[in-house]
From Swiss-Prot:
Its EC number is 2.7.7.7, 3.1.11.-. It comes from the Viruses. This is DNA polymerase. It comes from Bacillus phage SP02 (Bacteriophage SP02). SUPFAM superfamilies: DNA/RNA polymerases. The keyword Nucleotidyltransferase applies. Replicates the viral genomic DNA. This polymerase possesses two enzymatic activities: DNA synthesis (polymerase) and an exonucleolytic activity that degrades single-stranded DNA in the 3'-5' direction. Belongs to the DNA polymerase type-A family.
Amino acid sequence: MKTLSIDIETFSSVDLLKAGVYAYTEAPDFEILLFAYAFDDDPVKIIDLAQGDTLPHEVLVALTSSKVIKTAYNANFERTCIAKHFNLMLLPAQWRCTAVHATTLGLPGNLDGVAKALKLSAQKDKAGKALIRYFSVPCKPTKANGQRVRNLPEHDPEKWEKFKVYCIQDVEVERAIKNRISKFEPLESEHKLWALDQEINDRGVRIDVDLVKHAIACDEQYQAGLIAEAKKLTGLPNPNSTAQLKKWLEEKGLTISSLAKDKIEELIENTNDETVHRVLRLRQEMAKTSVKKYLAMEKALCPDNRVRGLLQFYGASRTGRWAGRLVQVQNLPQNKIEDLDTARNLLKGGHYEAIELLYGQVPFVLSQLVRTAFIPSEGNEFYVSDFSAIEARVIAWLAGEEWRLEVFNTHGKIYEASAAQMFKVPVESITKGSPLRQKGKVAELALGYQGGKGALIQMGALNMGLAEGELPELVKAWRTANKKIVKFWYDVEAAAIKAVKERKPVKLQHGLTFLYESGILFVQLPSGRRLAYAKPKLELDERFGKEALTYEGKLESGKWGRLNTYGGKLVENIVQATARDCLAITLMRLDNAGYKTVMHVHDEAVLDVPRGKNELDKVEAIMGEPISWAKGLPLTADGFVTDYYKKD
C-alpha cells in the first residue's frame, strides 16, 4: 500500500504544551505554515502555505483515501491540525504513528533521541527550536519590530528558507526511522487499539465550566485572605516572598536554612511564639496548589466545553500503559468527602465561606472536587467501571499461586485471605478493622514485586501502626505464603539473563517468552504483544556479587541512560502490561457494543451513556468476559452510575 510521510509547521497563539493540540487548533489565528511530504521513497517536497502555495490535488485526495497510509512522528498532531486547517474528516485507522512504533521498541519518545539511538545518517536539524520560536509562536511587540505580535516570512526571508529545510529534514528523519524499525511491525490489534485511542481523545470529555471557574475564584479569595492575614501579622509588603519572610523570621530569633515544606514543619515544632506559629501555618497554606488541575482544564478547554487529548497511547514505555496528559487524569486526588453533592453545590453557588465553615481547609475541598469537574454530555450519565484487584489477579495467574486464584474465584477478599495464609488463622476470624487485615493489606500492596522492608515503609506500614522491628518478619511470612510468586521472580530474571547471554528464546508458562533480536530483549506477553528492553547488557552487580541485567531507557531525570533491572521489576512490568492488555481488549469490546468511552484511568473505564438505559450490568459483564489468551484468569468488574466523575 502507498505511504504518505508528513511533517507540518504551524502557528497558533495558544500554548501547545499547556493546552494540547485540540485547543491549539481552535485558536482563531491557527494555521498550517508549511506542509512537507513524500510518497513512499520519493524526494521530499514542501508546500509553502503561508506564502500562498496550495496543496497538490493528489495529496488532498491521499489524505482521505483508504488506499494510502499516512505516517508522521506524533501523528495525532499532524492529523488533528490537517483536519482542522483543511476541514477534512481524517480517520485514525488510515494513519500510523512512528513515535508510538519507536516507543514499543524501547526507544526514546522524541524524534531527535530515536535518530541518535539508531545512529541514523539523517539527524534532526538542531536549529529547529529557534526557528519554531520565531515563526510558530507570537512574538513580543517592541519598538525594533514595529510593535508586531507575530513574525511572518517577509520579516526574515533567510530564516524562512531555513525553516523550510528544517521541515523537509523532519520528514527525512521520520521516514528513515520508519524504514529502520519496519521489520518489527506492531500487532494489527495494537494498531486498532491506537485508532480507538485516537477516537477517544478526539471525543474528549465534557467539563463543568461553572465548577472550574468557581474553584479558581474560591482559591483566589482564600489566598487573598491568607496574604492579608500574613501582612497584618508580619507587616511585610509581600509575606509570600521567601526572602522577606526569612528575614522576618530571623528577626524573631529563628535560624533559617530553608523554607521548604519539611523545614517549615520543623520550625513550627521549635517555636513557642504564637504569631510566628500562625505565620508559618499561613505559609504552608499559601504553598498548597489545589487549583493546578482546574487551571489545566481551563487552558485545554475547547469551545464546546470539552477537553481532549488527555491520554497518551503507550505513554509508559516499560508496560505499554497509557500516560496522562494536560490534566493528568491518572493522578487525581481520591474522594474523602462523603457528601460531594453539597460541596459541589456550595462551590457553584459561590458560597465560599460556607465551604470553609463546613469542611475546613479550602484547598482540601477544592482538591476533593477535581474529579467531579468531569461530567457527562447533555442528557447522559457516566458509567464508571473498573477491574477488581486486577494486578493481584494477574500475578496469581501468571505465577500459578493456586490459593490466591481460589480466593478470586470465590469471596475475593485478598487482604483477609493473605493475612490468614501468612499467620495461619481462619479467614473468618479476620474482620475489617483487625490488625491482621491491616498487615495483610500493606503486605499485598508492597511485597508482590520483590519489595522488602523498605517497600513496606514506603507503602506507609509505620503510619498504619506497625513497628519497624516486625517488618522483616512480615516480609518473610508473605514470601512463605506465596512461594510460587517468589519462584516466578527468580524464573523471570533467569530467563531474561539466559536470553541475552545465549541469544536463544526462553519460554515460561502462559506463552511468556524471552528473546533477543537486533540488540533488543523482547518479552512476549500472553497476549502476543512484546515488551522491549533496548541494548541489554549483563553486568556485575557488586551489591549482590552476581550477574545483573541492564538496558537503555529513560532515567528519572528524563535523560536517556542505562538502567538496572531484576526479577521483581521485570515481573511488575509483565503484570502491569498484561493488565493493560486486559483493559485494551475490554475497551475494544465496549466500543463494539456501542459504548462511548471518554476516559480510562489505570484499570477503569468511564463511559458516556444516554440517561436511563440501565445497562451497567451489561458493561460489568463485558468487562468480566473471559479472554482467549488468558484461560483461567478470573476477571470481575464493579461499576456505578453517576452524574459526575468520582471514586466510589
